């Protein structure tokens, strides 16, 4: 597992955050092919994104822009609904989120993903916009399980996803 944190300006909109994610992934791909790089031929070629709030909106932008992604986790996504997302996507929203309410952000983001694409929406009771960074175990639990299923192809994690407290999904 290789992780990358992309820091953008606090005022950057989801598009800018998504562009930063796609540029970061492109840098990983380039380093994997560059002799002399510490990553040369060490990456498995499986890439996914995750982000929170405007970064969650950025993940949907990245999923629209980079068709090589294998998974996307949008936590408490804030931003406009994307069309053309063809990457398996988990949308996590918080029932108590006043910044990116489920009804106006998470649910429309989920609905905008075609039914032909594996997708899941989890609503965390009591969850709020800062919940993932404030030790929100459920966001981490569902996000990790989703990435394990779609990045690694490890279906042993499916029961954890299916046990989510409030979910909508087309994943079998």
Residue map of PLM features:
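A conserved short beta-strand
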Residues: 67-79, 121
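Active-site-adjacent alpha-helix of alpha/beta-hydrolase-fold enzymes
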Residues: 85-154
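Hydrolases whose catalytic domains are alpha/beta-hydrolase-1, hotdog thioesterase
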Residues: 58-62
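Gly/Ser-rich "nucleophile elbow"/oxyanion-hole loop immediately N-terminal to the catalytic nucleophile
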Residues: 13-57
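Conserved alpha/beta-hydrolase
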Residues: 1-12
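Active-site loop/turn elements of alpha/beta-hydrolase fold enzymes
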Residues: 7-9, 77, 126
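Alpha-helical scaffolding within the catalytic cores
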Residues: 35, 76-80, 103-110
């Amino acid at each position: 597992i290789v992780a990358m944190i992309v820091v953008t300006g606090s005022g950057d909109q989801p598009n800018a955050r998504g562009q930063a994610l796609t540029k970061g992934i492109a840098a990983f791909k380039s380093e994997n092919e560059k002799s002399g790089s510490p990553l040369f031929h060490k990456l498995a070629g499986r890439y996914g994104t995750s982000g929170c709030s405007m970064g969650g909106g950025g993940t949907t932008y990245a999923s629209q822009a980079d068709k090589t992604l294998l998974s996307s986790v949008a936590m408490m996504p804030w931003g406009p609904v994307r069309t053309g997302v063809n990457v398996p996507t988990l949308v996590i929203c918080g029932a108590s989120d006043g910044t990116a309410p489920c009804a106006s952000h998470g649910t429309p983001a989920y609905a905008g993903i075609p039914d032909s694409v594996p997708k899941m929406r989890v609503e965390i009771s009591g969850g709020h916009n800062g919940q993932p960074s404030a030790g929100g175990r459920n966001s981490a639990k569902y996000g990790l399980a989703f990435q394990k299923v779609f990045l690694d192809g490890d279906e042993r994690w499916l029961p954890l996803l299916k046990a989510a407290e409030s979910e909508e999904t087309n994943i079998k």
